[in-house]
Amino acid sequence: MMSASRLAGTLIPAMAFLSCVRPESWEPCVVPNITYQCMELNFYKIPDNLPFSTKNLDLSFNPLRHLGSYSFFSFPELQVLDLSRCEIQTIEDGAYQSLSHLSTLILTGNPIQSLALGAFSGLSSLQKLVAVETNLASLENFPIGHLKTLKELNVAHNLIQSFKLPEYFSNLTNLEYLDLSSNKIQSIYCTDLRVLHQMPLLNLSLDLSLNPMTFIQPGAFKEIRLHKLTLRNNFDSLNVMKTCIQGLAGLEVRRLVLGEFRNEGNLEKFDKSALEGLCNLTIEEFRLAYLDYYLDDIIDLFNCLTNVSSFSLVSVTIERVKDFSYNFGWQHLELVNCKFGQFPTLKLKSLKRLTFTSNKGGNAFSEVDLPSLEFLDLSRNGLSFKGCCSQSDFGTTSLKYLDLSFNGVITMSSNFLGLEQLEHLDFQHSNLKQMSEFSVFLSLRNLIYLDISHTHTRVAFNGIFNGLSSLEVLKMAGNSFQENFLPDIFTELRNLTFLDLSQCQLEQLSPTAFNSLSSLQVLNMSHNNFFSLDTFPYKCLNSLRVLDYSLNHIMTSKKQELQHFPSSLAFLNLTQNDFACTCEHQSFLQWIKDQRQLLVEVERMECATPSDKQGMPVLSLNITCQMNKTIIGVSVLSVLVVSVVAVLVYKFYFHLMLLAGCIKYGRGENVYDAFVIYSSQDEDWVRNELVKNLEEGVPPFQLCLHYRDFIPGVAIAANIIHEGFHKSRKVIVVVSQHFIQSRWCIFEYEIAQTWQFLSSRAGIIFIVLQKVEKTLLRQQVELYRLLSRNTYLEWEDSVLGRHIFWRRLRKALLDGKSWNPEGTVGTGCNWQEATSI
């Protein structure tokens, strides 16, 4: 029966492996069925239940210890295998058999003690073999002679003492890189490189750095051609260095790298004699790196390098520099991370590329004379330019690439006269002055790339980009605009495909700011101060694919619909904004949910307000913005009722006043027998006939007349209601042609109708003073209807007619009136039903 400890030793690795391949979670797998990263899972053997389709397998840091034959037969498609630090001590014959597609094998950090002659058999496609720190003592016993496809062999940090290249190297015809750095090689003899004489490897790059070199036999490298030779930290004294470099005589190398590594210097001193032996080499490109010595008279140091095409100094301290003059035939000069006493004087007729970056000292730029220069990189030097830029500054009219980024103050005093061939221009993180005073780039009609990011530029001039008709990429992040408003400054940039306006403190933009940018594909508006998403300015961007509005303060979209986004848009970034998750913005929040395929990292879009929803993902938001139907119905009905009441009160204000008066005076005494309504045109008849006969007759009747009985200073309407109707038993309406045409008379008549309706004892007596045309009478529908249906008195100016008229009128007025011969007037409001004649 299996012991508990043994069972645990089996189950723990198995469980670890299953955690790697379970379908629910492919971690730590990178690409299911293709790439598996199973580091540090405590495997003691090669897992056999990975899919056959596996192409990339990382088993590093597992205690495999032993690789037997056909260890990887389950992975016939394997292309990359990493076995770093797996404590492998033994590799048997055919361990990698069946891996015919394997191109990369990494064995770093394995203490190999037994390596069978057929250990690497079957690797018919292997191109890269890394055997760093594998206790390898000699290349002679390394069984790789059959790996004809091998391009890169790295055996650094081993115990190799001899540089002798075995005869099998003649089979490695595709070998391009051999790394023997950090071994124990001290001497190189002619016989060590015999195989390279017999079978030249013209593309071979050889790294011998960090070997304690003491001797190179003269002629050892004679007539040998290499692509690259690196010798860094190889020599412990200047004399040894001189001797070894002289031993390289006859070598033809495309690129030679000499020097030391940072903080690992062995040399105590360095002078011009160290490189004298280079005169016997044929070199195309030369690099000297990390010599932390104060070199004086550096030009004499490179007398043997006047004809190299490329010259490079990296991390070299130079006390004094004479002219880099026309004697040098360099086409490419690179000075990186060096220390200068002053900016060097450059006068190089054939130089096409100058890289002068990250240097210290000599902060003031001085003019150079480089008539063939096409590429100039002066970045990261802290340089200041009193005037920039024109042909006289650089001594060339052929310049196509100019990088002045990460420098000091650059004062723009010229619009690049003589530099019309420029295609690439970079000013980022320098301090530009006078940028908005004139059209700085007016001459640069061939410019394709422009970067003025973080240059303290304040755009106050709409013609700042005039002339840039060929520009495709514009980066201007970290600058500012007048009033934080983006104006129409891109009108000439019709070929622009990339525009970066991030971190510009923008709050608003012109609706036509981008109208001319029909070719624009990428627009970055992030890190600004927009509070709403305005889609209208983008309607003309028919080629736009990427729009970044992240890290603004966007709460919602503007009121217009969101259809103005171009149909070409594929990626919209609205992350890290201040979304307001309220009912007021429900349509915008719903739009976000509908456009989740368009939005970048939509799951990171979170609510900022209100406080109870802060931090909540917009996608998971579920706002109920519909009110209860009953509440809505009651609210609407209440509004309608209030509105109708208000309209009725306004329209029937005087009728309501009459109603209030009837309630107030309904049971009081009447002062008048009748209130007379008539036209002022009929006032003579009223005075001479009506008043005289009724008030002076027997019995006498008291009439209410406006010219006599209305109270001065009171509104006419109030007098009509309070003095006329409320204090009278009856109403006499004198109908005439003038009456019908008078608005006041009609108003009084309408109030009289309401009064008659409200008071059961009230009565209206109509007197038709003269014949009225029916067409005129029909204009007053209610009056016409009443006269048609009710009895009325008609005035006739004859003896008989008068007699009948006054008798009938007195009879009508006596109805409801208490009268005694002594002339005492009784109550008139006895609430008996009135008789209307």
Swiss-Prot record:
GO biological process: defense response to Gram-negative bacterium; detection of lipopolysaccharide; inflammatory response; innate immune response; macrophage activation; MyD88-dependent toll-like receptor signaling pathway; positive regulation of interleukin-1 beta production; positive regulation of NLRP3 inflammasome complex assembly
GO MF annotations in UniProt: lipopolysaccharide binding; lipopolysaccharide immune receptor activity; NAD+ nucleosidase activity, cyclic ADP-ribose generating; transmembrane signaling receptor activity
Subcellular location: Cell membrane; Early endosome; Cell projection, Ruffle
Disulphide connectivity of cysteines: C29-C38, C279-C304, C388-C389, C581-C607, C583-C625
Gene Ontology CC annotations of this record: early endosome; lipopolysaccharide receptor complex; plasma membrane; ruffle
Residue span, LRRCT domain: 577-627
Glycan attachment residues as annotated in the record: N33, N171, N203, N280, N307, N495, N524, N573, N622, N628
Top-level taxonomic group: Eukaryota
SMART domains: LRR_SD22, LRR_TYP, LRRCT, TIR
Annotated function: Transmembrane receptor that functions as a pattern recognition receptor recognizing pathogen- and damage-associated molecular patterns (PAMPs and DAMPs) to induce innate immune responses via downstream signaling pathways. At the plasma membrane, cooperates with LY96 to mediate the innate immune response to bacterial lipopolysaccharide (LPS). Also involved in LPS-independent inflammatory responses triggered by free fatty acids, such as palmitate, and Ni(2+). Mechanistically, acts via MYD88, TIRAP and TRAF6, leading to NF-kappa-B activation, cytokine secretion and the inflammatory response.
The protein, known as: Toll-like receptor 4
Organism: Gorilla gorilla gorilla
